[in-house]
């Protein structure tokens, strides 16, 4: 049985986050998703479509960015960034999902917002994003997260988790899928274990054989 577990960051409340001193930076990101009744190849349930994006640095993340609390509320700052990368969406405090403290030398609190759209609305966001100011610059394109696992137990979500993610994005994705009941925790653990094993094997192939 796999010993892999869903990684977790230190969660704090929104009120606690707002009380943090000026030495802390605030990042705000949005997870947009929609129920998807479709089937891949006519047999693999899609279940949900979740949007992430490929960034300028080659890392995957959610739409959003840093918010200067001296000039903007969390939501106003987030909407300003979303306007540059998506072009046609405004989130509110009602969409707030969580705040987590990041690990490492930089003092950053990461806020995540989540909004469920219809599949048609989600597709409209994808179309609008192509015409946004940051498309092809800071944002290289939106991607849908494959929330299924194929028969080989690697294709789909495990392969997706093998990609490189920016900062807290991977942990935020797993957290949101869990708390929004979009994927059972045991399925998250299985996908993580498969992704870790794949990465381990890939690394072993790159390393020279020991003499």
Curated annotation (Swiss-Prot):
Subunit (UniProt): Homodimer. Interacts with TP53BP1 (via the Tudor-like domain); interaction is abolished following DNA damage and TP53BP1 phosphorylation by ATM. Interacts (via the cytoplasmic part) with SDC4. Interacts with TGFB1I1 and PXN.
Record-level Gene Ontology MF annotations: RNA binding; snoRNA binding
Family according to the record: Belongs to the Nudix hydrolase family. TIRR subfamily.
Nucleotide-binding keyword on record: no
Protein name: Tudor-interacting repair regulator protein
Cross-link (Glycyl lysine isopeptide (Lys-Gly) (interchain with G-Cter in ubiquitin)): 10, 151
Outcome reported for the amino acid change (mutating residue 151 to E): Still able to interact with TP53BP1
Gene3D superfamilies documented for this protein: Nucleoside Triphosphate Pyrophosphohydrolase
Coiled-coil intervals, chain numbering: none
Domain of life: Eukaryota
Main localization of the protein described in the UniProt heading: nucleus
Region (Interaction with PXN) residue spans: 118-205
Function comment: Key regulator of TP53BP1 required to stabilize TP53BP1 and regulate its recruitment to chromatin. In absence of DNA damage, interacts with the tandem Tudor-like domain of TP53BP1, masking the region that binds histone H4 dimethylated at 'Lys-20' (H4K20me2), thereby preventing TP53BP1 recruitment to chromatin and maintaining TP53BP1 localization to the nucleus.
Site (Required for interaction with TP53BP1): 10
GO cellular component, as recorded: nucleus
UniProt lineage: Eukaryota, Metazoa, Chordata, Craniata, Vertebrata
SUPFAM superfamilies: Nudix (SSF55811)
Annotated keywords: Isopeptide bond, Nucleus, RNA-binding, Ubl conjugation
One Pfam family per UniProt: Nudt16-like
Subcellular location, record wording: Nucleus
GO terms of biological process kind: negative regulation of double-strand break repair via nonhomologous end joining
